[in-house]
């Protein structure tokens, strides 16, 4: 189980291959890659900046990952989340889950990204033609995370 918060980009294919090579019990792998969009709520986005609270963010991601491990029989998981300034089409986040069977891999991957979007302490600002604006939490993200409440 690996969590990395980093400024530099990542190679998703390499990361998945490396994760699978560690464990021959894996029968299914699911991944999610989040990208910077060029539009948000109808506005053009020139760039996005993500900030985080060093130490607190890592602890929260560990808790989220532990919750997934309590719910599904995962063999491996990987969360890579970037911070800093990124432009449209750049990768932001990679979530990979691996299990003996596909159902656990699919469900846990969806759970991790839903909870990461709402429970991990990242702050996002966007550069638009109007200037730099802080992005508020979206109700749709909260609803997606709420469906996983026990």
Language model feature labels by segment:
Residues 1-92, 106-110, 114-150:
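N-terminal, polar/charged subdomain of small-to-medium soluble alpha/beta proteins
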Residues 92-99:
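Short glycine-rich or small-residue beta-strand-to-loop segments that form or flank ligand, phosphate
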């Amino acid at each position: 189980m690996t969590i990395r918060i980093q400024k530099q980009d990542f190679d998703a294919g390499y990361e998945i291959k490396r994760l699978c090579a560690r464990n021959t019990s894996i029968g299914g792998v699911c991944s999610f890659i989040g990208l910077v969009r060029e539009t948000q709520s109808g506005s053009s986005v020139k760039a996005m900046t993500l900030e985080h609270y060093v130490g607190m963010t890592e602890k929260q991601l560990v808790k989220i990952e532990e919750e997934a491990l309590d719910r599904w029989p995962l063999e491996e998981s990987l969360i890579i989340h970037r911070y800093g300034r990124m432009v449209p089409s750049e990768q932001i986040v990679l979530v990979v889950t691996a299990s003996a069977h596909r159902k656990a891999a699919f469900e846990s991957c969806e759970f991790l990204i839903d909870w990461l979007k709402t429970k991990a302490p990242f702050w996002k600002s966007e550069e638009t033609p109007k200037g730099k604006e802080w992005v508020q939490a979206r109700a749709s993200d909260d609803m997606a995370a709420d469906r996983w409440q026990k």
